[in-house]
Structure formats: structure tokens, C-alpha cells
């Protein structure tokens, strides 16, 4: 019989209804994951490039792309938009996962969430979150 060993492992969940730059994309545990990633040390980045004349180390520099280089210039184009909506009333969010808006504001509805709530995206702010279904009028 094989001997069982206990090793630490990390399970990561993603909520793809939120864009990657939104904290809820990584779930409520995003801060815990960030702390774990900061403690993680990957020795491969400290090794020198083999076959290189100079002894520069590989670094993990982040690369940012200009929005103009992107195939889509419309932020909501990466989402599956079910319908456009117009806010009938002002809504002040009570929780971090809710999206606030003002009367007349246009939103993109991404999906239904739970009874009476929709998941919406606001092109103007680039944010997404839950909105009360009775506060918006869907444009079909």
C-alpha cells in the first residue's frame, strides 16, 4: 500500500463574470492568494540564461500592452452581453459585489444572478457587479 504524504496545495477559483482587473474576479479570497504568491519563491528566475554571452539574470518584468493594440476597443466586447439596460433609479451599493449607478445610466447586462439580481457591466467605469433587476429597464 502506498504511503500517503500531506503536502500544502492551493486551490484557486475564478469568477469569470468579473473582468480580470476586478477584485471579485479572483473571489473573496484574492488577498489571501496574493499573500501566498508573495511568499512563493521561484528559483528559476534567479538562474542565468544558458548560452548567453553575458551573465544577465532572467527577470519577471511585467509587460503592459497599449489598449490601441488590442483587437477590441470596446471593453464589453470581451463579455457575452445578454442585453443593454438603462437605469430607472439611482442605486447605491451596500456590498463590494454590487454595482452602483445613477438614473439614466447605461449598463450591459451579462447574466442573471439570483432572484431579482442581474450581473451588469458599466462601460464608463469599467466595473461590474450585481444590480437589482427592478432598478433597470432592459432594451431588447
UniProtKB/Swiss-Prot annotation:
Gene Ontology BP term (one): intracellular signal transduction
Domain SH3, first and last residues per copy: 80-140
InterPro entries: SH3-like_dom_sf (IPR036028), SH3_domain (IPR001452)
Assigned GO CC terms: endoplasmic reticulum
Pfam families membership: SH3_1 (PF00018)
Matches recorded under SMART domains: SH3 (SM00326)
GO molecular function, one term: protein kinase activator activity
PTM info: Phosphorylated in vivo. In vitro, phosphorylated by shk1.
UniProt keyword annotation of Phosphoprotein present: yes
Cross-referenced Gene3D superfamilies: SH3 Domains
Keywords attached to this entry: Phosphoprotein, SH3 domain
Role noted for this protein: Stimulates catalytic function of the p21-activated kinase homolog shk1.
Subunit structure as annotated in this protein's UniProt entry: Interacts with N-terminal regulatory domain of shk1 via SH3 domain.
Record protein name field: Shk1 kinase-binding protein 5
Organism: Schizosaccharomyces pombe (strain 972 / ATCC 24843) (Fission yeast)
Gene from which the chain derives: skb5
